[in-house]
Swiss-Prot record:
MF annotations from Gene Ontology: imidazoleglycerol-phosphate synthase activity; lyase activity
Protein name: Imidazole glycerol phosphate synthase subunit HisF
Keyword DNA-binding in annotation: no
Native source organism of the sequence: Cupriavidus necator (strain ATCC 17699 / DSM 428 / KCTC 22496 / NCIMB 10442 / H16 / Stanier 337)
Enzyme Commission number(s): 4.3.2.10
GO biological process: L-histidine biosynthetic process
Length: 256
């Protein structure tokens, strides 16, 4: 079995790392370069940077931040937020990103995913899906895709959208439960399982990690290939090394 990845996530707005609850109530968490360096030293497998207001604010890419981080951090960087064109993908890769995450722009123009993967390869295109449960209690579970930092409903079914994006060449799906984001109540394992079972590419579970058991559950019960977290790492509750040691004790293969 391939090693499972632990990925700290840095949500960035106006050049600072922030963390919210249910995509709002943002709280400052520090300088992105310092935080990224810390996670590199702790043994993170990758780092994900998301400019969470670039699309809704119509802002350009955070190239200078990525250049600064890439010069000091030597693990893969995934970067998203405000990516609208294949040219944007090129600019971020040139700045030092290893993978590019697209979200709102993939929904506005699904061909972007096809074109970007054709030019740069599936391995560096990640489609981020922000999903909120739309089914009532007792109904078959359904989740709707939201865009623009969780502010805009699309009417799209999250599982079907993940299937389409994988078919268009996306190399990974970054799946965030909006219902669990920042709540520390654990992943939406039903959502994670539904998408993981539906697509032939790796799924990164995101949204809701409150402790180390939640990370392990994302792999063992959610069937994710990687787990992403922010709050438990940003505020010193746990280190990445502690998370890896816990997962190894649970019998999950990780790179120590």
């Amino acid at each position: 079995m391939l090693a499972k990845r632990i990925i700290p996530c840095l949500d960035v707005t106006n050049g600072r790392v922030v963390k919210g609850v249910n995509f709002v109530e943002l709280r400052d968490a520090g300088d992105p370069v310092e935080i990224a360096r810390r996670y590199d030293e702790q043994g993170a497998d990758e780092i994900t940077f998301l400019d969470i207001t670039a699309t809704s604010d119509g802002r350009d890419l955070m190239l200078h931040i990525i250049e600064d981080v890439a010069s000091q951090v030597f693990i893969p960087l995934t970067v998203g937020g405000g990516v609208r064109t294949v040219e944007d993908v090129r600019r971020l890769l040139n700045a030092g990103a290893d993978k590019i995450s697209v979200n709102s722009s993939a929904i506005a123009n699904p061909q972007l995913v096809s074109d970007a993967t054709a030019k740069y390869g599936s391995q560096c295109i990640v489609v981020a899906i922000d999903a909120k449960r739309s089914s009532a209690p007792g109904e078959a579970p359904r989740w709707e895709v939201f865009t623009h930092g969780g502010r805009k409903a699309t009417g799209l079914d999250a599982v079907e959208w993940a299937r389409e994006m994988a078919a268009r060449g996306a190399g990974e799906i970054l799946l965030t439960s909006m219902d669990r984001d920042g709540t520390k109540s654990g992943f939406d394992l039903e959502l994670t399982r539904a998408v993981s079972d539906a697509v032939p590419v790796p799924v990164i579970a995101s949204g809701g990690v409150g402790g180390l058991q939640d990370l392990a559950d994302g792999i063992t019960r959610g069937r994710a290939d990687a787990v992403l977290a922010a709050s438990i790492f940003h505020y010193g509750q746990h280190t990445v090394g502690e998370a890896k040691a816990f997962m190894a004790r649970e019998g999950i293969p990780v790179r120590i």
